[in-house]
Amino acid sequence: MEVRVFEGEFKGDGLSMAIVVARFNDLLTDELLSGAIDCFERHGVERVDVFKVPGSFEIPIIAKKLAESGKYDAILALGVVVRGETKHFDLVANEVSKGVAQAGLITGVPVIFGVIAVEDELQGLNRAGIKSNKGFEYAMAALEMANLMKKL
């Protein structure tokens, strides 16, 4: 029996990436964006285009449009949704995750879900730079998926 394993590498040679980032909660999203750009720079990505949208809810439509353009090997969606006193948090978090997943499935281009849903700003700060930077981690996933797709 032959078993073949395929895996994407963490290299940016020849890759073009798009980042869609929400401006809402920019104290946190700016840190996620910095982490992602740092990752792409360290791994030699040739081109990164950043698209800023008002909030996380607006991410999926832009991610889908960018994926359809054929210009990018992967799209990275970055945002922060902080729980408040209303159901708005649940609605936004659920719809954004569905929309980002659909954008990738419909277009066949990896669209990485980098929207963090947190209980409060402190949790957000812990994920966007104080303890670690999830933006860097999500960018690593984008690299891996873009390279894996090239093998298929």
UniProtKB/Swiss-Prot annotation:
Annotated residues for binding of (2S)-2-hydroxy-3-oxobutyl phosphate: 85-86, 127
Which Gene Ontology molecular-function terms are recorded? 6,7-dimethyl-8-ribityllumazine synthase activity
Q: Name one GO biological process term.
A: riboflavin biosynthetic process
What is the reaction catalyzed?
A: (2S)-2-hydroxy-3-oxobutyl phosphate + 5-amino-6-(D-ribitylamino)uracil = 6,7-dimethyl-8-(1-D-ribityl)lumazine + phosphate + 2 H2O + H(+)
Quote the InterPro entries the UniProt record gives. LS (IPR034964), LS/RS (IPR002180), LS/RS_sf (IPR036467)
Sites binding 5-amino-6-(D-ribitylamino)uracil sit at 24, 56-58, 80-82, 113
UniProtKB keywords? Riboflavin biosynthesis, Transferase
Record-annotated active site: 88
One GO location term (cellular component)? riboflavin synthase complex
Enzyme Commission number(s)? 2.5.1.78
Q: In which pathway does it act?
A: Cofactor biosynthesis; riboflavin biosynthesis; riboflavin from 2-hydroxy-3-oxobutyl phosphate and 5-amino-6-(D-ribitylamino)uracil: step 1/2
Role noted for this protein: Catalyzes the formation of 6,7-dimethyl-8-ribityllumazine by condensation of 5-amino-6-(D-ribitylamino)uracil with 3,4-dihydroxy-2-butanone 4-phosphate. This is the penultimate step in the biosynthesis of riboflavin.
**Family the UniProt entry places it in:** Belongs to the DMRL synthase family.
Protein name from the UniProt record? 6,7-dimethyl-8-ribityllumazine synthase
Query: Per UniProt, what is the name of the gene that codes for the protein in this document?
Result: ribH
